[in-house]
Amino acid sequence: MKNWLCVVQRSHVLRGVELGIVQTNHGVKSGIQRMTPGDGLVYYSPKTDYPEGDALREFTAIGTVADREPWQSETGLWRRAVTYVPATATPIAPLLDALELTRGNKNWGFIMRRGQVEISQHDFSLIAREMGAGSLIE
């Protein structure tokens, strides 16, 4: 099992949660294919909207990749099903020194520019607890 951090503005995250899907890096297939059923997924949203949204810098949704193959939507974008759990949006700032992904890295924002990053179980568990989604790690 792997854990993924996907970087998407909050408005798109909320739409994905509503639809029960994940779509990464503008809907390309490669990122979606790396995910497998049971993988953890957490969204980080630097802004509320893109490109004109307000700064946010929060983890905005969390769940697990569902047992369904990726599919291409009617608009040509690749998606996977996700089972999201209720969670509270959580700022990243208080966690920067605790997360293996960002600890000791002043330029952690550059990592996020990749759009999809594999994260450790430690980081996924910490984020899940902070978001009140402990059921994902129990």
Feature annotation, model-predicted:
Residues 45-51:
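Short, charged beta-turn/beta-strand-edge "cap" motif at the junction between a beta-strand
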Residues 115-138:
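Charged phosphate-binding loop/patch that engages nucleotide di/tri-phosphates or the phosphate backbone
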Residues 27, 33, 51-57:
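Alpha-helix N-cap/loop-to-helix boundary motif
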Residues 12, 49, 71:
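Surface-exposed, flexible loop/turn segments at secondary-structure boundaries
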Residues 10, 47, 86-88, 123, ...:
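A broadly conserved detector of short glycine/acidic/proline-rich loop/turn motifs that flank catalytic sites
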Residues 55-122:
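Aromatic- and Lys/Arg-enriched surface recognition patch
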Residues 1-37, 131-138:
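Compositionally biased, charged N-terminal/linker segments
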